[in-house]
Amino acid sequence: MVTIDEVAEILSKRSLEYSMINYPDKKEKSIDIIAVNRNKKMIVKILGNKKSSKIKSDLKNIARIGLGIPVIIEDSTEQEIINDRGNILGMNVETFERILDGEKVFLYKTRGGIFVKINSKELKKKREEMGLSLGEVAQALGVSRISIYDYEREDSYVSIDIAEKLVELFGDDILGDVLSGFKVDEKDINLETQTASLSDKIMLNLNEKGYKVVKMNFTAVDIIASKNDKKLLFSVEADNVSKSLRKFNEAKKITSKIKASLIVVVKESKNKKIYEKEDFNTISENEIMNYEFD
């Protein structure tokens, strides 16, 4: 099983910008590394052969709010194939390295089988350069004219058989990249505000102000909010000052890589000045419901 340090070494060898997230340490955490590669922010978790639906929930929330591409590095995945792990991209370390080196990965494995991503713009460009009609291409592939129209309208996933025929006609430039344009459906965002916890109060306030809000469970950030281009990350004070400072510093690593603002939420008002001396932007629990986040 590949380790966090080994993945960090892979990134270092390529002189890529990254941060290792070291909070929490006594239980599973959802983010091991945040890396920036060719303007793509990758939120990385090394799982090996382990499975954790709770960790995956955190990763999906990060993607839903638009902070980066959620990646799980695992041992079981085949090389040069990306697995659909419920709107998270699962891959082995060799495939991860290929992506870092600028290679496109076009094979995507779901429960329905293995599919190939097609670059719609390149497909249309090649077809028009060759002077072929939609009908002629459809006949060559044994599909409907509407199918070819759909392939050209937006990037699509097709069967391996169809992909091979497309490559025979137009060359491998028409193959797409699974990471390109990756996004998670926002309709699954759940505020989870059944209780009146501190985090729930913050989320309610943000939601009323028009923010998209998600709750995190296994990292240094407790809440992530997004509105237009504005992104806010909230880290709630832990059990003691020492643990809180470590948590806040790890949260700062996350915000620095995804260009967001960090807000520290203080439970004990007597500690507010301590955190402010460390240059953290703080709000107290009593200020939450009336705080203007805009």
Swiss-Prot record:
Domain HTH cro/C1-type span(s) in chain numbering: 123-175
Q: Which Gene3D superfamilies match?
A: lambda repressor-like DNA-binding domains (1.10.260.40)
| GO MF terms held by the record | DNA binding; DNA-binding transcription factor activity
Superkingdom classification of source: Archaea
The DNA-binding region ranges are 134-153
**UniProt keywords, alphabetically:** DNA-binding, Transcription, Transcription regulation
* The UniProt record lists the keyword DNA-binding: yes
Per UniProt, what is one Pfam family of this protein? HTH_3
Write the protein's name: Putative HTH-type transcriptional regulatory protein STK_12680
- Species whose genome carries this gene: Sulfurisphaera tokodaii (strain DSM 16993 / JCM 10545 / NBRC 100140 / 7) (Sulfolobus tokodaii)
Q: What is the lineage of its organism?
A: Archaea, Thermoproteota, Thermoprotei, Sulfolobales, Sulfolobaceae
